[in-house]
């Protein structure tokens, strides 16, 4: 039978390479089932990973791989970083980008001692392997698994990752145990999820249009009594983000055994995977007697059908690699005073989201954001553009914190999302001009605002008119190309309620009268970035969204309104006053199943049952705010998130509430836990079409009753 497209012959050296892999896996304390992932990738996966650095170079030359910060530089690139005079460098072992002066050894080839030793160890293994194969030794031995190792780490963490962050937030499988059942939620209410292709910052967004209804996959058979893991073919009935509703072949129109699955898991494979990896196809016990000729049945069902690309999981893992590493330093907005930045260190990277620790703060003084967030900048950005920064020395008591012990370089500018270039000729924003802007302290409001200061590189300091601060501490920095600022009368033209300055009524506010009274002028409409892509979002679509007032939380949410490229996000179970405006390309919204894919804790909708009224003192204590300003939220007692500063008090209240609660929850009750996090990497992957694969059915095995 013809071999499926994209499958290569296994190199003759594969047994020896597998032995080397087994040696490496001893790092995980003898975790045997990880080997199943290696075999599941197939022989073509092994050779792909071991030669990925060469293949990636060829693909980039052919224009097939997107440019990423890691691909912008090579170890010998003699370019200087922005105004710093330091040469950039790339670690030859892990690929991390940094400054040459901060790298290890005289040659500056590695970012740390561990990378240098790993490179040396792998080179020796490669040299020994070459001699055993009768090949002459070379001056520079090829490093075994150089590119594959991070992929294996990613797959291992994805399939078996457990644990907690320092703040107690569960990760990996620990987080999924506390997870939310998207499948039941969508099916019970007939909700529609936003497609993955709407989110440009998530894994494989540019290939998800190939995932369609009727597609065939090979999936783990959970209705079998055999001692080993067996598989069966299933059809995609419905797609919802990364999750799909599957039905085993043979059930035909019977939906009673349909089940939801995340396509990012390692138990879903393209047709032909079982044949390549000598896995057994066994029909579910429920229907095993329905047909006597399963081979013939599958031949009819599979001919001409579509399936996943052969390298689907390889590309998934590759797209979940991120350039930021623990210990990198950067500048981030000060959450206690948004008009300035502070120095911070990357503590954790999960799915492209960064947990940052302020250098002059406590161990729990953190800030969450995506690596493409406009709130973070390379070291030196504030000084260069004229933005305020808090100058303080690093706390001596933080010197022993694990993250601060790993500081080895500043995050280089190439790692940050680039802003649009601006041209100031022919008129530009001026100090005192009026406009409309999303209130950074209350993201559900679009307010009348003023340009307080014009910075360099197109950045503007904006303040909301009528704000409580008179010292400029509530000014906020927006770039001129930001989609959070709008020309005057934008809200009126799009039927959005504008929040007027203090002393004005929304229904009587007039821009003309206000400009005349304040003797100011409106910023010209031509200066604003009003481009609107065909983003694909529609009212009612479900997604996972960051609560920007408490950015460590990702919640179940709904697109409430679409105004050009502006989305009004409603958090399910919360009042409308907590809705937030975000851009359609915001890195703070994710497709259904993203948290499950990355191991981040998803916050379910708030329970709707009535709660006991809070005492005034308790209510005051439970209020929480984002940047220490206006925004306040009082979640119900059962679902409020744990805060580091009041763990003891909250724990006592939770124990009292648990004592009064019934021993078992109602069947349809949703129990929410306000914690969360994530794990892994992300980037964009090259586009691959879903091939029509031949039908490998020789290995179908009939299951018999014991």
UniProtKB/Swiss-Prot annotation:
Q: Does the keyword Transport apply?
A: no
| InterPro entries on file | Mbt (IPR004092), MBT_L3MBTL2_rpt1 (IPR047356), MBT_L3MBTL2_rpt2 (IPR047357), PcG_chromatin_remod_factors (IPR050548), Znf_FCS (IPR012313), Znf_FCS_sf (IPR038603)
Q: Name one GO cellular component term.
A: nucleus
Instruction: Kindly give the SMART domains that the UniProt entry links to this protein.
Output: MBT (SM00561)
Residues with the Phosphothreonine modification: 77
Q: Locations of Low complexity compositional bias?
A: 39-50
Residue spans of biased composition, Basic and acidic residues class: 54-63
Q: Where is this region: Disordered?
A: 1-85, 606-669, 685-706
Q: What does this protein do?
A: Putative Polycomb group (PcG) protein. PcG proteins maintain the transcriptionally repressive state of genes, probably via a modification of chromatin, rendering it heritably changed in its expressibility. Its association with a chromatin-remodeling complex suggests that it may contribute to prevent expression of genes that trigger the cell into mitosis. Binds to monomethylated and dimethylated 'Lys-20' on histone H4. Binds histone H3 peptides that are monomethylated or dimethylated on 'Lys-4', 'Lys-9' or 'Lys-27'.
Q: How does it assemble?
A: Part of the E2F6.com-1 complex in G0 phase composed of E2F6, MGA, MAX, TFDP1, CBX3, BAT8, EUHMTASE1, RING1, RNF2, MBLR, BAT8 and YAF2.
- Give the protein's recorded name: Lethal(3)malignant brain tumor-like protein 2
């Amino acid at each position: 039978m013809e071999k499926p497209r994209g499958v290569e012959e296994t190199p003759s050296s594969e047994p020896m390479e597998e032995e080397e892999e087994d040696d490496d896996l001893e790092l995980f304390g003898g975790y045997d089932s990880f080997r199943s992932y290696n075999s599941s990738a197939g022989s073509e996966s092994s050779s792909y990973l071991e030669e990925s650095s060469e293949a990636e170079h060829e693909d980039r030359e052919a224009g097939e791989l997107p440019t990423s910060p890691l691909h912008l530089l090579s170890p010998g690139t003699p370019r200087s970083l922005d105004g710093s005079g330091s040469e950039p460098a790339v670690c030859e072992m892990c690929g991390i980008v940094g400054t040459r002066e901060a790298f290890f050894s005289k040659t500056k080839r590695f970012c740390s001692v561990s990378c240098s030793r790993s490179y040396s160890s792998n080179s020796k293994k490669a040299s020994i392997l070459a001699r055993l194969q009768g090949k002459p030794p070379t001056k520079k031995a090829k490093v075994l698994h150089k590119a594959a190792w991070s992929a294996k780490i990613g797959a291992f963490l994805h399939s078996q990752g457990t644990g907690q962050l320092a703040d107690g937030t569960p990760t990996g499988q620990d987080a999924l145990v506390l997870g939310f059942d998207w499948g039941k939620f969508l099916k019970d209410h007939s909700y529609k999820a936003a497609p993955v292709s709407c989110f440009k910052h998530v894994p494989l967004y540019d290939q998800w249009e190939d995932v369609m209804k009727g597609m065939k996959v090979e999936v783990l058979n959970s209705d079998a009594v055999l001692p080993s893991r067996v598989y069966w073919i299933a059809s995609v009935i419905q797609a919802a983000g990364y999750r799909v509703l599957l039905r085993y072949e043979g059930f035909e129109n019977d939906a009673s055994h349909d089940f939801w699955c995340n396509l990012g898991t390692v138990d879903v494979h393209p047709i032909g995977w079982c044949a390549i990896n000598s896995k057994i196809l066994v029909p579910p016990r429920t229907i095993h007697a329905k047909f006597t000729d399963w081979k013939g049945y599958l031949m009819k069902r599979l001919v001409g059908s579509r399936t996943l690309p052969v390298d689907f999981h390889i590309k998934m893992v590759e797209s979940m690699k991120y350039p930021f590493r623990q210990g990198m330093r950067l500048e981030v907005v000060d959450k206690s005073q948004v008009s300035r930045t502070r120095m911070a260190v990357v503590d954790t990277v999960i799915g492209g989201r960064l947990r940052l620790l302020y250098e002059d703060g406590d161990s729990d003084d953190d800030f969450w954001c995506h690596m493409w967030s406009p709130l973070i900048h390379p070291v030196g950005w504030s000084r260069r553009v004229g933005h305020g920064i808090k100058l303080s020395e690093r706390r001596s008591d933080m010197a022993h914190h694990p993250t601060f012990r790993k500081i080895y370089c500043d995050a280089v500018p190439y790692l940050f999302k680039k802003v649009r270039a601006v041209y100031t000729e022919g008129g530009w924003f001026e100090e005192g001009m009026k406009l409309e802007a999303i209130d950074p302290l209350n993201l559900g409001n679009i307010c009348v605002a003023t340009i307080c200061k014009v910075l360099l590189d197109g950045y503007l300091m904006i303040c909301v008119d009528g704000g409580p601060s008179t010292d400029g501490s509530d000014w906020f920095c927006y770039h001129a190309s930001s989609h959070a600022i709008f020309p005057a009368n934008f809200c009126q033209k799009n039927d959005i309620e504008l929040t007027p300055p203090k002393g004005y009524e929304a229904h009587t506010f007039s821009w003309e009268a206000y400009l005349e009274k304040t003797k100011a002028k409106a910023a010209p409409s031509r200066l604003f970035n009003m481009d609107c892509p065909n983003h694909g979002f529609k009212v009612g679509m479900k997604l996972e969204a960051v609560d920007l007032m408490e950015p460590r939380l990702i919640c179940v949410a709904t697109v409430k309104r679409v105004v050009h490229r502006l989305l009004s996000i409603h958090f399910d179970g919360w009042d409308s006053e907590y809705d937030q405006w975000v851009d359609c390309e915001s890195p703070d919204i994710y497709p259904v199943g993203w948290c499950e894919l990355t191991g981040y804790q998803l916050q379910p909708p708030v329970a709707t049952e009535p709660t006991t009224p809070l005492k005034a003192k308790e209510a005051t204590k439970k209020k929480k705010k984002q940047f220490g300003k206006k925004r306040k939220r009082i979640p119900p007692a059962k679902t409020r998130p744990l805060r580091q500063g009041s763990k003891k008090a909250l724990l006592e209240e939770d124990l009292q509430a648990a004592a009064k609660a019934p021993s078992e929850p109602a069947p349809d009750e949703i129990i929410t836990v306000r914690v969360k996090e994530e794990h892994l990497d992300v980037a964009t992957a090259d586009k691959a079409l879903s091939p029509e694969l031949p039908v490998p059915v020789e290995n179908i095995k009939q299951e018999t009753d014991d």
